[in-house]
Amino acid sequence: DNGIQPVPVYRPVSDKLGDAYPEVAATSEVDQLIVAKLRTLGIVPSEKCTDEEFLRRVNLDLTGSLPLPGEIRSFVASKSPLKRSKKIDELLKRPAYAAWWTTKLCDYTGNNAQNLNDPVFRNDMARQWYEWIYHRVKTNVPYDQIAEGLIMATSRQKGESFRHFATGMSHHYKKENPVPFHTRKSMPFYWARRNVRKPEEKALSFAHAFLGVRIQCAQCHKHPFDQWTQQDFKKFQAFFEPIQYKANTPRSEKGSGMNYQSLMKEIEQFVGYDKKKKNNRKQLREEIRKRAN
């Protein structure tokens, strides 16, 4: 780590530098930053795309689907100078936008029933994860608040009894008039996955999902062409060491008969649950649902 220090180097790919670089319109601060980077690299942006190209790209980006033939004809025939911005606003209001970007965010954050730490309700948990994000995308909740709801999520509150926690959660599983899961302030399943139990796994997942950075190499060694050292990784990993998600029982509840272990043992004995028999899992799930109602 101490012997190698990466130095960022920009190497232009053309002679379009300085005064030779053409004027490029940038209507927003983001565009200005992009153009500044392109100017440094000597890359001239592509020409403005055609209406047909724009409509196809914006539909795929925002809704994951292609425009209908009638929509294409109407858009191309329009003479309005604002038709592109209006089309973007229109697509952002479509249900397909919320569905498509919820799917993307679930993918980025690792929503996978097979990795959720509950063999009985993992499919329900994956669905609740999706619904929690979908509601926020649909109602235009800012991304920083969505990220906060995932990163700072809690399940059982400090000092909350298991009985009170179990009663509150059971309302989401009722057959009639269940409480929508998206009404919860936070979504705790991000930290409930089986593949993020260790602090280093949490660090890798967080860096990829929320920072867009892959730091696997720094976990073992200093990469000669990357800025992250193994020491950086260990410091970053330390942030995630206090985070835990497990069915632990506080000392005050041990022996009370009202904790996770004792309640699950009671239900398993009632249905004759055997982990080796798959059909027992369905009976166990049905019994838990029955008690929730």
Please name every model-derived segment:
Residues D1, V7-D274, N280-E286, N293:
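Short, structured secondary-structure elements
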